Amino acid sequence: MNTNQKSRENLRALVESSLLVALGFILSYITPFKLPWGGSVTPLSMLPILMIGIRHGLKWGLAGGFIYAGLQMIQQFWPPPTGTVGGYIAVVFLDYIAAFTILGLSGLFRGRKFGLLIAAPICTTLRYLSHFVSGIVVWGVYAQDMPVWLYSLTYNGSYMIPEIVLTTAVSAVLCITAPPVLFNMKKPAKVNEISDTSE
């Protein structure tokens, strides 16, 4: 790949990634279900971020997820109940930076026929895990008489599990019905096309 072609590919990836981050951010404003101390069901808002990695690889996926994390902090930041410096650091890292940058790991499955379907449940569950750890480390003060781990599991699961299921279901539909170009995959050449090029 020459320099000009590489530059065009990078520009294309930048534009597409920016549009997908913007789409995810817009979808995150659709909140049919919102919890009192952060967390809400935002249908399919994670899917565009997953698509960045699927279309352009790990580097772009992680970068897109990181930028999306910053936008989420700007949109609605939930300060820790303790108000300590350590609490703020934990919230910023676990509930935002790690939770959303993780979605870019979808880039590990780039080029696979059902890459999105594999990435969707794995990456979204990893986000759930990040919030789960945050619930134990930071938000456990709200657990009252409930075990902290169970409180975090149920609280974060109440919005993350519906999101995981919905995102995975739509990913399955896309993998089955969408053309390869959606996933930045070349359509396999037909037999007669292969024979023509070999002559």
What is each model feature region?
Residues I52-I54, S106, R110:
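Helix-capping/transition residues at the boundaries of transmembrane alpha-helices
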Residues M1-V21, V148-E199:
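Alpha-helical transmembrane segments and their cytosolic interface
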Residues G111-L129, K186-E199:
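Internal alpha-helical transmembrane segments of multi-pass membrane proteins
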Residues F25, Y29, M73-F77, L108, ...:
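Membrane-embedded alpha-helical segments of multi-pass transporters/permeases
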